[in-house]
Curated annotation (Swiss-Prot):
Expressed by the venom duct. It comes from Conus striatus. GO terms for cellular component: extracellular region; host cell postsynaptic membrane. Residues 26-49 have a biased composition (Basic and acidic residues). It is found in: Secreted. Negative results: shows no or weak inhibition on neuronal nAChR alpha-3-beta-2/CHRNA3-CHRNB2, alpha-3-beta-4/CHRNA3-CHRNB4, alpha-4-beta-2/CHRNA4-CHRNB2, alpha-4-beta-4/CHRNA4-CHRNB4, alpha-7/CHRNA7, alpha-9-alpha-10/CHRNA9-CHRNA10. Has no effect on the release of catecholamines evoked by nicotine. It holds the Pfam family Toxin_8. InterPro entries: Conotoxin_a-typ, Conotoxin_a-typ_CS. This is Alpha-conotoxin SII.
Length: 72
């Protein structure tokens, strides 16, 4: 194998590993859409724009429809 061919193979390997190891935002956004969505059932707002906690862990303290200082 000539020097030019070895350099070309080296560049192809570097390019392939860079593309494979580069994190894709498109793939992760699909999985996290509901977690980031503020209109999901775990994160609601009342008419004044204040948040309320609909998480079952804090639901007894801050029910949906009442304002709480901490939201998900």
């Amino acid at each position: 194998m000539g020097m030019r061919m070895m350099f070309t193979v080296f560049l192809l390997v570097v390019l392939a590993t860079t593309v494979v190891s580069f994190p894709s935002d498109r793939a992760s956004d699909g999985r996290d859409d509901e977690a980031k969505d503020e209109r999901s059932d775990m994160h609601e707002s009342d008419r004044n724009g204040r948040g309320c906690c609909c998480n079952p862990a804090c639901g007894p303290n801050y029910g949906c429809g009442t304002s709480c200082s901490r939201t998900l």
